[in-house]
Amino acid sequence: GVAPDGGSISVNSYYMELNESPFIPIMGEIHYTRIPNEQWEEQILKVKSGGVNVICTYVFWNIHEETEGVFDWDGDKDLRKFISLCQKHNMKTLVRIGPFCHGEIRNGGIPDWLYGRPFLIRTNDREYLKYVDRLYAEIASQLEGFFYKDGGCIIGIQLENELQHSAAPWAIRYPDQPIDYTVADYDVQNTKFGVSVQEQDIQSPEAGNQHMKTLKEIALSHGMEVPLYTATGWGNAAIIPQEVIPVTAAYTYPTWADIGMSPFYLFRDIHTTPDYSPVRYEGYRYPSFCAEMGVGIQMTYGRRPRIPAEAGEGLMVRSLGSGANGIGYYMYHGGITPQGKRGFFSDEPSGVPKMSYDFQAPIGEFGHTRASYHSLRIIHHFVNDFGHLLAPMGVVLPEYSDTITPSNTHTLRYAVRKKENAGFVFIT
């Protein structure tokens, strides 16, 4: 992508370039609808002060179109105001436009009024796409003038989320009936709860890839043209080969998985073998961007782990040493899930609280900073100062790296990023 001032953003198979120089994006997730709009500017500045250079945010469909045909972009839902503040403070932005988002929001962001309609959601069903087209038109009108090609701050768009990997339970269902999930009938068997490894074959992988391609075409038809398009690539999720960057994740304290020691403190070459493999793409063809690094986690009624700051710091060192050339925090700033006309928008069937979405993030739901904010900022300063050198460097692992297990606390864990006669050593 090229900006009016001659600036440029491009991507090769290993790293991103900003103005023709290697660049490592440090992306922090903050949900504007979960923070009072009067506080947006202060919180954006707080994110920036933490060393984050790209702000990411979800656009939750059901929060903006709670009643069919009536869109609300005012107050705490004023997406245009939020993006304008990012622009004011020179914060690059990546917008996750759905239609399905998850984010522990009711139905994953799909409006209640779509439940039971005679078509398949999250597919190329013609009737479903009519609603998607209308949604994207609305989002595009909010973002108009802020795209990179216009001299704006929006450098990227994420399409959908975890398509053919995960879903949210419908918050409404018929009495005494099992939970329905926000997926097409042919994807029910593929659906996982939370970010995880997909053990079985996807039933209709081409249908998923085609739907992603259609979503991109609809976005472009409404002028949402950006240098970077991303898609969640973990767990064999759908992507658009050679047209989007498949992004990865790493949660060290997942509340949806069995309790155990995390593998995400073990160095490996995640450029060739991404975390949560198998995946639907060849890793070496794409840069390794991590979109959901869980340095915190959302409390649930069933599991309430407390995550120390050292855990997040170790995860980031491991990811960079393993070849990550893009770091994305989910969440970097917590928030409070808003209330709608018929109740709270939280994903209560999944066991999350009605309101709190603190996520034990570096910046908490009330704007308070945690110890992780300060320890991670040191790493961010390193990446911002030396990322142009680090990004082109390959990964070198010790010969014994494949034999180390998460429970092994005695053997030194390290990796080297090197190019020619220079390099960096990463130790956890």
Where are these regions (language model features)?
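Alpha-helix N-cap and loop-to-helix initiation/capping positions
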Residues: 70-77, 127-131, 203-207, 306-311, ...
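N-terminal carbohydrate-binding accessory modules
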Residues: 1-54, 84
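Carbohydrate-binding surfaces of carbohydrate-active enzymes
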Residues: 129-136, 140, 150-155, 163-165, ...
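Acidic-and-aromatic substrate-binding clefts and catalytic sites of carbohydrate-active enzymes
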Residues: 32-38, 64-65, 69-74, 236-238, ...
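Active-site region of glycoside hydrolase catalytic domains
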Residues: 88-94, 101-267, 276-296, 324, ...
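Short alpha-helical segments and helix-capping/turn motifs at coil-helix boundaries
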Residues: 40-42, 74-82, 139-145, 211-217, ...
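Aromatic-lined substrate-binding rim segments of carbohydrate-active enzymes
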Residues: 40-113, 215-220
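Conserved beta-strand positions in the central sheet of alpha/beta enzyme cores
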Residues: 56, 94, 158, 328-331
